[in-house]
Every structure is written in C-alpha cells, then in structure tokens.
C-alpha cells in the first residue's frame, strides 16, 4: 500500500475514455487515475468494461475517444510496444505463454539486451519463492505457476504501471501472501498497481483505493478505508437477484438426450485405487444427484485426476467404473458417449474455440459425434435455450466466443457440457475469475443439474465454495485422498484447510 505522499504527479490518468463494439457502448466516458506507490483495485461484474479499459491502457485495443496521460504526456492511443516502453505491463487472467519454449525463454522473450539479466531473474524468483526449473517447458506448468511466470515477465521489464487481472484466482493462500509481499516491495519503489479481482478480503488487504465499474461507467470510487462491503456489493450488483433459478429457467435447462435415469444416491462413478501422473491410490464413489467436492491445494493432483478420468492422461493403475462397467481403455470420445463430461479449468485454452461462433461452441461436443464441422439448423435454437436458462449476454449467435466477458464465456462452456447430456459432470474451478452475480448463477445451475440426478464432481480451490455447494467432500494432499469423506458439519473451511495441509491423520477413504 501507499506509504508516502509522493503522488502529486499521477503515473496514469485516463480521461473521458469511450469505446463501442458492434453499436454497443462498452465504455462511457471513463475517468481513472493511478498514483505512484498505490494499489488501485478495479471491480465490476462480467461485461462491466474492466478488461476493455485495461486493454486500452496496455495498447491492445484503441479507444474511440479520450486520452491517456502518462508521465506528463497525453496519448490518444498506444500500441503494446509503446505501452511497454512507457512502463505499462498487463498480466492477463489467462496466462499467455509459449508452451513449447522453456520457462526462462518465456520470461526473457522480447526483452532488450540490456535487460537480459540472469541475476535479476534469479533474484525475482527467490523473492517470489518460485522454485522453477528454468529449462523446463512452460507447457508443463499448472495454472498457478503460469500466472507467476507472467508476473515475472512484467517485473523483468521494470514496469512502473503493473496491471494484474485476477492474479490470485489460481493461487493458494501461501502463494497469495508471497505475491502480496513482493507487491509491497514494488510499491515502495514507486510502482503503481491496478488490481482486478472479485475477492473482497484480498482487495481490502492490498488496495489503497477502489473503483467499481458497472455498465461501462464508474459506479463507485473512493479510498478503501471509506467504502463498506455493502457499498461495494451494491455498486457491483444494483439489481436484487433471485436466489434460485426461476421456473422458466429450470424449464429451459431440462437436459437433452436420452440419458439413463438413476435414482438419487445410486453409485454412478467408482474409482478403485487409481494411480496416475500426480496422484496415487485414489478411491471414491460419486452418486447420482449429488455434488461431490474435491478440495486441496494447488498441485495436490485434482486436475490430473480429472483429466485422467476423461481420458486425457494415461492411467497407470486401478479401475474406473462408470455405471458398473470398466472404462479404463475407452477413448475420450467413447467416455463422452457414455455420459462422462469434463469442464476444464482453463476455459480459453482448453474449453472453448475462441474464434468460433457461440452457437458452434455450445454444440461442439455434439458436433464431434455427428462430424466435427457439421452444422444443423438447430444450433441457434440450442444457443437461445441456454441463453434463457443461464442468462448469457451476447448480441448474436455468430459472434466469436472471445468477444464475451469472462463470466459469459464460462456460461457458454457450461452450456457446451450440458448439451452433451452428462450422467457425470466433472467441473474444474467453474467460477474462477467470475464475478459475484455470475457466480450465483453458476451455483444455482449446478444445483439444478444435480436435481436432475446428474452426478457432479466439483473441483475448486475456493473452500467457501466447496462448503456452500458440496454434499460430501474429499480432500487431496500430495496426490492422495487425505481423509475419509467429510459430511454434514465437518464440511467447513477450517476442517478442509487443515486436511489439505496434511494436519490430520490420514484415513483410508470410505466410499
């Protein structure tokens, strides 16, 4: 946080910034200021305009009108190269690394020779507590480590204006604290940080000022100490929302296809002593109509387990039983045909085709079954059904998925999975980077799916989310199920955290 009064000359002033897409005003005269040595948090619902504003500041997208004042000079528009030269660096929510290059090559990519300091990079790695093998491929990193590499790229460029878009979305509490410690050191040097997040406790911990965007405008702005949580939430979501899906939404959400019907509580998916990359000896049972939470720290093996269940990774031992039949040797497509559907944690690189239309994305899994690029007259109608059910905001079915906000992209991905008519739905971090309003929609959606006797496996690093949603909870620690299933009052953040850190005598998982 800001520790001095050396803020007379702001690092950045955005004045009267306007932006329009396809006739829709997404920014309506935005004013935004960032001072030296401060963290200015930016909040807002999905589609509020946060990402568009930051892309304009970073030179990725031009504004239609308005100016950016940086270092006492005014600019109508910037390019990414010019923004970097001015000390502006945007760390995106979805890390954009070269998977086939080493970690070292990714960090140093595009740097001027004078900045190619191995010692500087090693010092930054040590300060952040990162224990990377710099010669390993970036593609081998999990989401949390890819986020750290992106932050390192910005720090290596001596950035004076650092824009962090959901930087802690995939970080553990310990990793978050390490990051905040490093940010405090940067602030002391006069760096200014724009911090985009949906996590209010973190914002109160790190931010000097808060601005809330709504519908392309600044709805609220002030010092963190002077704004109450109620003020902030009201500014983000001014319209009172229903706590559950409406009757019409539930009607639109009736799952398609001829799925085998199981009574609630019937075992649907059983894992017997499963061993694979990142996990070992995992045994559990998932029942029809329940939401089974799978908690654990980043690196505990949860995503590796999910990808193995879907056939994306090789199984080394044990059995996967779906409806009483072993599916170990089945391909991903064959598992999909039998009703096993997986929603990956990284929607942009693994879940959606960002350049394809919304209608195509929603029907992508059924396209695979009919012929990859097959099209039907029903695709637009299918998209419309999910728009009504999930409250997805878009202009036309043909627009590309990349044009949507993060929350609406996530809803398109969920619709894609539901259209495959799942018996078992594995959802990995379903609300990562999603605002309060859209998060509530997704929670009610998952409950509605489970009410149709779909078996839901919920993988989440948000322990409050696990506590809120799960009927039973397994916790993974260092690749193993660390305890028998938690139920009832034992499903609470404190107990889950204790088990996740291994501070509990391990018991054999009881199914």
Curated annotation (Swiss-Prot):
Residues 12-240, 240-503 form the ABC transporter domain. Its EC number is 7.6.2.13. The complex is composed of two ATP-binding proteins (LsrA), two transmembrane proteins (LsrC and LsrD) and a solute-binding protein (LsrB). It is found in: Cell inner membrane. GO terms for molecular function: ATP binding; ATP hydrolysis activity. It catalyses: ATP + H2O + (2R,4S)-2-methyl-2,3,3,4-tetrahydroxytetrahydrofuran-[AI-2-binding protein]Side 1 = ADP + phosphate + (2R,4S)-2-methyl-2,3,3,4-tetrahydroxytetrahydrofuranSide 2 + [AI-2-binding protein]Side 1. The gene is lsrA. It is an enzyme of class 7 (translocase). This is Autoinducer 2 import ATP-binding protein LsrA. It is a peripheral membrane protein. Belongs to the ABC transporter superfamily. AI-2 autoinducer porter (TC 3.A.1.2.8) family. Keywords: ATP-binding, Cell inner membrane, Cell membrane, Membrane, Nucleotide-binding, Repeat, Translocase, Transport. It comes from Escherichia coli O9:H4 (strain HS). ATP binds at residues 44-51. GO terms for cellular component: plasma membrane. Gene3D superfamilies: P-loop containing nucleotide triphosphate hydrolases. Part of the ABC transporter complex LsrABCD involved in autoinducer 2 (AI-2) import. Responsible for energy coupling to the transport system.
């Amino acid at each position: 946080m800001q520790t001095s009064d050396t803020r007379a000359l702001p690092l950045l002033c955005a004045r009267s910034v306007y932006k329009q897409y396809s006739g829709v005003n997404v920014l309506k005269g935005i004013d935004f200021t960032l001072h030296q040595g401060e963290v200015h948090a930016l909040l807002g619902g999905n589609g509020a305009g946060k990402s568009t504003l930051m892309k304009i500041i970073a030179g990725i997208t031009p504004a239609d009108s308005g100016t950016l004042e940086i270092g006492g000079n005014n600019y109508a528009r910037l390019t990414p190269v010019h923004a970097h030269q001015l000390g502006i660096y945007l760390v995106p929510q979805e890390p954009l690394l070269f998977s086939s290059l080493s970690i070292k090559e990714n960090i140093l990519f595009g740097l001027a020779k004078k900045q190619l300091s191995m010692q500087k990079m090693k010092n930054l790695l040590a300060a952040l507590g990162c224990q990377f093998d710099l010669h390993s491929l970036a593609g081998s990193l999990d989401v949390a480590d890819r986020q750290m590499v992106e932050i390192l790229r910005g720090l290596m460029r001596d950035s004076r204006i650092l824009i962090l878009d959901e930087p802690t979305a995939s970080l553990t509490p310990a990793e978050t604290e390490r990051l905040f410690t490093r940010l405090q050191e940067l602030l002391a040097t006069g760096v200014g940080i724009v911090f985009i997040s949906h996590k209010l406790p973190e914002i109160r911990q790190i931010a000097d000022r808060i601005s809330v965007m709504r519908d392309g405008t600044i709805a609220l702005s002030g010092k963190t100490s002077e704004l109450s949580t109620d003020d902030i939430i009201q500014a983000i979501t001014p319209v009172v929302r229903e706590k559950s899906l409406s009757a019409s939404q539930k009607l639109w959400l009736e799952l398609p296809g001829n799925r085998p019907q199981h009574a609630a509580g019937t075992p649907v998916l059983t894992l017997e002593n499963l061993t694979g990359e990142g996990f070992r000896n995992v045994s559990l049972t998932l029942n029809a109509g329940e939401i089974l939470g799978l908690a654990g720290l980043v690196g505990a093996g949860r995503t590796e387990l999910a990808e193995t269940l879907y056939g994306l990774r090789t199984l080394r031992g044990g059995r996967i039983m779906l409806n009483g039949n072993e599916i170990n040797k089945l391909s991903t497509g064959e598992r999909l045909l039998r009703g096993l559907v997986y929603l990956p944690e990284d929607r942009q690189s693994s879940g959606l085709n960002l350049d394809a239309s919304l209608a195509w994305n929603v029907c992508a899994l059924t396209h695979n079954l009919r012929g990859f690029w097959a099209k039907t007259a029903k695709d637009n109608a299918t998209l419309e059904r999910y728009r009504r059910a999930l409250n997805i905001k878009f202009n036309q079915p043909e627009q590309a998925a990349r044009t949507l906000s993060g929350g609406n992209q996530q809803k398109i991905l969920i619709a894609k999975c539901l259209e495959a008519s799942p018996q078992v739905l594995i959802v990995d971090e379903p609300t990562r980077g999603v605002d309060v309003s859209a998060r509530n929609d997704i929670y009610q959606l998952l409950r509605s799916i489970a009410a149709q006797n779909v078996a839901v496996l919920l993988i989440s690093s948000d322990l409050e989310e696990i506590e809120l949603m799960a009927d039973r909870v397994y916790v993974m620690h260092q690749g193993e199920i660390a305890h028998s299933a938690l139920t009832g009052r034992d499903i609470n953040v404190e107990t889950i955290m204790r088990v996740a850190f291994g501070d509990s005598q391990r018991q054999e998982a009881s199914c």
